[in-house]
Swiss-Prot record:
Keyword Acetylation: no
Annotated coiled-coil segments of the chain: none
Main subcellular location of this protein, as a coarse class: mitochondrion
Disordered: annotated segments: 29-79, 335-406
Highest rank taxon of the organism: Eukaryota
Protein name according to UniProt: Altered inheritance of mitochondria protein 23, mitochondrial
Compartment(s) of residence: Mitochondrion
Family per similarity comment: Belongs to the AIM23 family.
Amino acid sequence: MSLRIILKRDFSQCIRVFESGIKSSTTTTSNRFQAQYGNKNNDNTKRNTNNGNRFHNKYNNESRRSYPKTKYQQQYQQRKQPYIIDPRKIKFNNGTESARNAIEEIINRIYKLQKNYQIQLITNSGLKNYHLSEILQNLDLSINGLQLIDKSTSTTTTTTTTTTNNGGNELPLIKIITVREMINQYSTYLNNLKQLELIKLGSLKTLKTLDIKLKLEQKKSTTKEILIKWSINNNDFKLQKTNEIKKLIGNGNGGKNFLINMVYNKRNINKSIDTIYKYQCKGDEIEEKNLIEIELQRRQLLINNLQSLLTELNCKWIIEGDINTKMTFNVTPSISQSTTTTTTQEQEQEDYNDIEEKKLNRTERKKRKSQQQQQQQQQQQSKTNTTKKDEDEEDLDALYSFKIED
């Protein structure tokens, strides 16, 4: 029994040793790929990762080289802006309804000119490009407003246009003004629209009013002219033309220029002296020369008289033309101290007269009111008297009838 047990133990140990030997041999001989690539400390792996696997080295995130951005990417980042609000959606808590309506009209007009609402703002330092929403968000309608300037009618200083990236189009000009000015401009704009509608309908009253306005504007804009013939007498000049010149200077034409044209005739303005006396003399040169000399002397006297008159009126002038054909005096009247004192005195007198008239009107009104009150009182008294008389008569009739019954 003991021998059997010993043999069994030895046999089991031998089997274990044999199995362990087989496993070791199989691992060392059969799995050569594991022996080649499985060991982390093997030199072949280092060779494959560092040198052999070029794609791994090229596209590894850690070893990737940072390339510079293209121009398109840089421009795209520069163009990136924060979210811009549509100007039509901006609501104003300040200001009146008329101011809000005026700004809405300006926004609509800007949209017709520039649909992306890019504008040019007139500032003290010059023109600056803005988006309309940037200005509207910082605008206080109770104080300030906006003005859209037409480049066709504006001056050269304000019409300096610059081409931008928006296809080379000219941006609309805007100026910050007071609210009153904006409302006044909006009211004139509405009046013009109404007039155009009435003209389309064919109303005659609007046409007449427009004609009157145009005539007044032409009178204000045009320089006034006085025409003097060379053949005028000294008496006529002193009586007629001096009064015309004085009236023109006195009637509100203080600083404005006016022209004095000295001509032969209205029809023949530039007619020369040489052609005047040819038909009279009939080829006689001596008579013609004598007449021309006399005419020149007379014209010179007329010029001297006019110059002396202008010096009396404290005017400055510039002479253009020639005695032989035509002469024009470009006159600029200067307001003297005497005229200013007289005008101030006249204004004071007019103001005093206006005050007195107002006082008289007040006194007259008071008198009228007092008279009306007296008349009303008299009428009331007369009514009360008539009612009392009627009552007394009724009482007497009642007493009389009572006595008769008794």
